[in-house]
């Protein structure tokens, strides 16, 4: 068996996630494509595919149980993180992957073609210039340095009165929370357990007040 698959299976076994055979094969295929393209396009600073399984795949998958709704957008998706792993886990949900760099969007189009992922739309745009036809149930990002920037730049993206922001962070960002704009409030903070990942991971769920 492919060493990446062996490692992925071992990591998943340390979580409570249910991942099908097809999903596991797609996740391994994604890592293989990321490794191949990374050599020419410098898509991630993580060079070792085994390390990608922990820092990129599992780090994204642990968000999976917390997705409520049908339509999601991954802002500043880069090479598709966390969007591609989450789309693989939720074939019944729609994902828009937004990034401003053409090389990343080209990579994402290759991924969804090669792995036959039918629920992802890659879009090349700056977030402030992206004007969706309708709002999203969840606005995901692990790219923003600050949650204040995230909610300010993305405030036009969630569904009115229903959509939420989902910020993936390291240590619990209490300092950042105090700096959030008046209209935004923290709905929940989830401590995430990522097998073999050093350091803390948290998912901060934010929504518009009122």
From Swiss-Prot:
This is Ribosomal RNA small subunit methyltransferase G. Gene3D superfamilies: Vaccinia Virus protein VP39. Belongs to the methyltransferase superfamily. RNA methyltransferase RsmG family. S-adenosyl-L-methionine binds at residues 76, 81, 127-128, 142. Specifically methylates the N7 position of guanine in position 527 of 16S rRNA. The keyword Glycosyltransferase does not apply. GO terms for cellular component: cytosol. Coiled coil: none annotated. Keywords: Cytoplasm, Methyltransferase, rRNA processing, S-adenosyl-L-methionine, Transferase. It is found in: Cytoplasm. PANTHER family: S-ADENOSYL-L-METHIONINE-DEPENDENT METHYLTRANSFERASES SUPERFAMILY PROTEIN. Its EC number is 2.1.1.170.
